[in-house]
From Swiss-Prot:
Taxonomy of the source species: Viruses, Varidnaviria, Bamfordvirae, Nucleocytoviricota, Pokkesviricetes
Residues in Helicase ATP-binding domain copies: 32-185
Domain Helicase C-terminal: 327-507
PROSITE patterns: DEAH_ATP_HELICASE (PS00690), HELICASE_ATP_BIND_1 (PS51192), HELICASE_CTER (PS51194)
Xref: Gene3D superfamilies: P-loop containing nucleotide triphosphate hydrolases
Protein name as catalogued: Early transcription factor 70 kDa subunit
Coiled coil start-end: none
Species whose genome carries this gene: Vaccinia virus (strain Ankara) (VACV)
Database matches in SMART domains: DEXDc, HELICc
Length: 637
């Protein structure tokens, strides 16, 4: 990134509509590398650093020269990008061509370019002289989207901007695909990746390190936001390597069914969803049922003497005594004394969603816009509510998050408990979350960090003095109390295989994290910085941000104010051009946020420049909607 741009800002105010200095510095780098040099870039910015806005600002710059195609994982994230595109446009302060920008979900892009599951090669010519931006790029490989991206790269010879806060999902294989997509050479994976008998023995070898450094030199942008404006994280439970884990000791009932399930799988259980199920809760005949829909149709089917299922509805005293789930027993007991909002991660949405819904209802927590809990717990005279988010939710997710994130819900009085499967691990932002729970162990530690990153990020908390509590729950045997302090104690299979599934999973993830961290440190070292005058294509964007910062602290100045002129000439060296720019923003009534007047416009009054507050007003029930296409980004759901 261009550190010369960062040096232009002093005590940057982040609390107003703004482009952060590192975002502008990165934008400069992207313009130079992708537009000027036609080279691909991996934007490896850690979660919460504002990758989306950087990408959209770049798309606006690039739209003046080329067509820009933006690919996002799903329809919900597409909505987020479309919303943020409006934010980026308002901050851009320069010309762009909106109809040159196309935003697609991966599924819609697939349907646009495939006929009967075969790539329509004749149609790929439309992508000549274009740029592709791929959000969550680590997720596109191993499927048709990844195949299509490779074909487009080879056929059209175009650059890619790949966004990822965690470019290695499970093994270095993902990084190998990223290298292949970004470089002009074909990668032989067998030469750069060494494979052992286990997944955790998949490593980037020395040749792979050299290939990485050679092919991606000058193509990596790494950034991690300083944590100075974040609340303290308080991890609960006993020490487990470099983190903390809450041991939830199973009852005899849960442990019995847990062991039956594990023996059925012959200990080959690391990725089997049934082990995720029974580690969360046991449900008798449901434990080994891969198609739950068949059992959901049963009438008054007994799972245990005090637990039955009827047409997909669980009922019985066991939902309160909770011998079926050591994790939920801990959770239900703990939340009774906690204040604030909760975010709870779980996997296997069908099984997990069933368990969660009826345990919560039976223990006095009401479903948001749904069933009321038994003897409901109250807050401010209203029932404490929960919602369950899964991939099946599409149209309602955005509205649900609006309620959860609203200032009126900071205390959880509107919606207190948000349960979510993997759909919430990427791209979404949660606000004022005080308790984060893991009901199941994530597949990777990058996913674990992504889930934390949905909540613990800059601008998500009004009061950062209050800590955020994290509970990583592990179901363990009734007599299991091992202290896990070193990976070196668990190098032999016979020692690992007898461990509870959750503990084994955590160790497995930690082994993989060693390789991930090694590669991340290489990428971090490859990220280049330089100090140059800003690229001509972003000068107006940069000046707009400098002006916003200046007039936040200045409500009224002389028209020939030396500080304002000095600030503008730090970018536009010619004083006459700088004065002309000042004339333009005053006569054009540039929009600023002032600490006294809030939303304001710049005006000339006699020999002064003043900030004039404004408010939009309209007649009741009278709205004007502008449908001119030059104001609308072309998009497809």
């Amino acid at each position: 990134m261009n550190t010369g741009i960062i040096d232009l800002f002093d005590n940057h105010v982040d609390s107003i509509p703004t482009i952060l200095p590192h975002q502008l510095a990165t934008l400069d780098y992207l313009v130079r590398t992708i537009i000027d040099e036609n080279r691909s870039v991996l934007l490896f910015h850690i979660m919460g650093s504002g990758k989306t806005i950087i990408a959209l600002l770049f798309a606006l710059v690039a739209s003046r020269f080329k067509k820009v195609y933006i690919l996002v994982p799903n329809i919900n994230i597409l909505k987020i990008f479309n919303y943020n595109m409006g934010v980026a446009m308002n901050l851009f302060n320069d010309e762009f061509i909106a109809e040159n920008i196309f935003i697609h979900s991966t599924t819609s892009f697939y349907s646009l370019n495939y006929n009967d599951n075969v790539i329509n090669y004749n149609g790929l010519s439309r992508y000549n002289n274009s740029i592709f931006i791929v959000d969550e790029a680590h997720n596109i490989f191993g499927n048709n989207t990844g195949e299509l991206m490779t074909v487009i790269k080879n056929k059209n010879k175009i650059p890619f901007l790949l966004l990822s806060g965690s470019p290695i999902t499970n093994t270095p294989n993902t990084l190998g695909h990223i290298i292949d997509l970004m470089s002009e050479e074909t990668i032989d994976f067998g030469e750069i990746i060494s494979r052992g008998k286990k997944v955790i023995q998949t490593l980037l070898n020395e040749r792979g390190v050299n290939v990485l450094k050679d092919l991606l030199k000058g193509r990596i942008s790494y950034y991690e936001m300083p944590d100075k404006d974040l609340p303290t994280i308080r991890y609960h439970g006993r020490k487990f390597l470099d983190t903390r884990v809450v041991y939830c000791h199973m009852s005899k009932l849960q442990e019995r069914d847990y062991m039956i399930t594990r023996r059925q799988l012959c200990y080959h259980e690391m990725f089997d969803k049934n082990m995720y199920n029974v580690s969360m809760a046991v449900l008798g005949q449901l434990n080994l049922m891969n198609n739950l829909d068949t059992l959901f149709q049963e009438q008054d089917k007994e799972l245990y003497p005090n637990l039955k299922i009827n047409n997909g509805v669980l009922y019985g005293e066991e939902l309160v005594t909770l011998n079926i789930s050591s994790k939920f027993k801990y959770f239900i007991n703990r939340i009774q004394t906690l204040n604030g909002k909760h975010f709870i991660y779980f996997s296997n949405s069908t099984y997990g969603g069933l368990v969660i819904k009826y345990i919560m209802l039976s223990n006095g927590y009401s479903e948001y816009n749904g069933s009321q809990g038994t003897n409901p717990h109250m807050i401010n005279g209203k029932p404490k509510t929960f919602a369950i988010v899964t991939s099946k939710m599409k149209s309602s997710l955005e509205d649900l998050l609006d309620v959860y994130n609203s200032p009126e819900n900071d205390d959880g009085s509107q919606l207190m408990f948000l349960f979510s499967s993997n759909i919430m691990s990427e791209s979404y932002t949660l606000k004022e979350v005080r308790h984060i729970w893991f009901m199941t162990i994530p597949d990777t530690f990058s996913q674990y960090n992504q889930i934390l990153g949905r909540s613990i990020r800059k601008f998500s908390y009004a009061d950062i003095s209050e800590p955020v509590n994290v509970y990583l729950l592990a179901a363990v045997y009734s007599d299991f109390n091992d202290e896990v302090t070193s990976l070196n104690d668990y190098t032999q299979d016979e020692l690992i295989n007898v461990l509870p599934f959750d503990i084994k999973k955590l160790l497995y993830l930690k082994f993989k994290t060693k390789e991930t961290n090694r590669i991340y440190s290489i990428l971090q070292e490859m990220s280049e910085t330089y100090s140059l005058p800003p690229h001509p294509s972003i000068v107006k964007v940069l000046l707009g941000e400098l002006v916003r910062q200046f007039f936040y602290n200045n409500s009224r100045i002389k028209y020939n104010d030396t500080k304002l002129l000095k600030m503008v000439t730090s970018v536009i060296k010619n004083k006459e051009d700088a004065r002309n720019y000042i004339d333009d923003i005053v006569n054009g009534h540039f929009f600023v946020s002032n600490k006294v007047f809030d939303k304001s416009l710049l005006y000339k009054y006699e020999n002064d420049i003043i900030t004039v507050p404004f408010r939009l007003s309209y007649e009741p029930f009278v709205w004007g909607v502008n449908f001119r296409k030059e104001y609308n980004v072309v998009s497809s759901p």
